[in-house]
Amino acid sequence: MKTLKATLFLLFFIHLGFGQKRDVINDQAIQFSIKQKKDTIHFILIDTKLDEIKPVFLFCQGSLPMPLFVKPAKESMWMIGGGITNFDLNEIKKNYHLIVISMPKTPVIVDEKHLNKSYCYIPNENEPDEFDKDYVQADFLENYEARAQKVLQFLRKQKWVDHSKLIVAGHSQGSKVATLIALNNKKVTHLGLFGANPFGRIDQNIRTYRKEAERKEITWQQANEDIEKTYQMYRDAYDNETLRKDPNLLSWKSFSRPLVNDWLQIKIPTYLAYGTNDIAADLCDLVPLFYIQNAKDNLTYKRYLDLEHNFFEINADGTTNYEKAHWQEVMNEFIKWTKK
């Protein structure tokens, strides 16, 4: 009888863990919220039910305050999801619970009238270039990492999560967030980096000015002036008084941290994928040299020829061909790698 009672209790407990009411958005994702004193962290799981136990795949999205879902005035709601709609979601869901965290101080669902042309959330539709002030103050690397760690702590307590594996990956700015998560969380088993800049962020501006001068799009005099202005902007980012007056500099300061130093400290399998026509990731070609110098063999890299930052093909005139996308191929190769 005691054994029967224990079994019934266990079954009841499991039923509660899997059967509680869910906040399902657009029949695509389940929303979760973690309330804190000064912030509420919203995140979504790309599914509508939790009847399978699977490992977590946390995808860290790129920059800018884009909502996870857009609500048009007349048409149906649709998902941005931090860019995951470019992926083969069914392939990912076969193996993992796919998680995406909302940008800080950014609603999960936003009416289309509160988006600018880049699909960024703007509180005032008459000021398309003005982001929410709270978002600007929260837009720094350490905050993104701290929020993600809270989400991972929550997920570790869920009965529908398989803890044998934890995949963390990010694209562009998200690769920086993913790096810090993996650096500080020993539960992470695989790290994926897409369109990453191994030397941070601000160096890209300087390299851009040089390339423009080399292509004679601007003079070397102009490039010199722009580079010097970039140095000054970065100095300002490290001046506390200037930083208080212009909180936008906080993002430049935190995200310009070189990643390659962190990567060399990470011992878990690391996957680096980038397009050869991506100026942000230009210097990824140097990364294997650092691993060789440090006798490290945990890096797998994939160089995608003639693709740009978001893995689209490039036309002969250098413009992006949005009809020829390769994100599904890129992500599926990564998923295959995580299963080896």
Region locations from a protein language model:
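Catalytic active-site module of serine/aspartate enzymes centered on a nucleophile-bearing elbow/loop
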Residues: 307-340
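Alpha/beta-hydrolase active-site loop
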Residues: 112-158
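Conserved alpha/beta-hydrolase "acid-adjacent" motif
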Residues: 279-286
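N-terminal cap/lid segment of alpha/beta-hydrolase-fold proteins
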Residues: 20-55
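Short beta-strand/loop motif that positions the catalytic acidic residue
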Residues: 266, 272-274
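Accessory cap/linker subdomain of secreted extracellular hydrolases
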Residues: 119-134, 141, 192-264
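Primarily recognizes the serine-hydrolase "nucleophile elbow" in alpha/beta-hydrolase
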Residues: 151-210
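Short, surface-exposed "cap/lid" segments of acyl-processing enzymes
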Residues: 50-95, 100, 106-112
